[in-house]
Amino acid sequence: MVELRVNAGNVKNPNVHKIGIIALGSHLENHGPALPIDTDAKIASYIAFRAALESGAKFLGVSYPAHEIKEINHGIHVSLDDLTNEIVNVLKSAKKHLGISSVVIVNGHGGNLPIVTKLYDIEEQTGLLITLNSKIIESEGPHGGSGELSMAKVLGIINEDEVKNQTDLSEYGEVGLFMFSEARKNDPNIEEGAMDIEENGVYVDEVYGNELLKLAINSVLLDVEKQLDSHYGY
């Protein structure tokens, strides 16, 4: 067997090769007229890839399906069990072919948050240490709002001609999850976001977008460091 030069390149600790970073977003859901339907997947992928570049960890790509709570219907999603099974299969393959032993999941879609209840099952089925990072969801604000618009500006995926129509909530009620009254009733955070969009509208600020992305990337880098420290004695 060939001996790999695990210290080659800009690698601070060769154990980082045992860590994978995978993006988890949503490819098929509406975000208003200014943002593509795969906004969450692209933002999560960017964060995961940049963190992999900076840390030296393995970039494992992006998971295809996504989950959503039943009160919200703005796209095509799968059950939590189906999402769990997909993640398990992808991570088993990564473990087999790349020899990883831990993973950071970079989640960019709020509907995937219930996956936290399945992390123990995923660890048991894969034999991997799993960290779920949802920092960007905690930081970006309402669905299709200024945070996502500003990050989309940085990534070059925004249609700026349509920003003026982003808050036409009679036509694009998914923005801020405004149209989903049951979800707003059940979740104060969703209600707050919907009211913010209705009352304050949206804006695009490239500096803000960069700040959000850097905050999320640094959070993932910290998770990688924690895995190195706890799992590999770094």
Please annotate each region the language model reported:
Residues 1-81, 85-102, 110-234:
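Extended, histidine- and acidic-residue-enriched regions that form the cofactor-binding/catalytic faces
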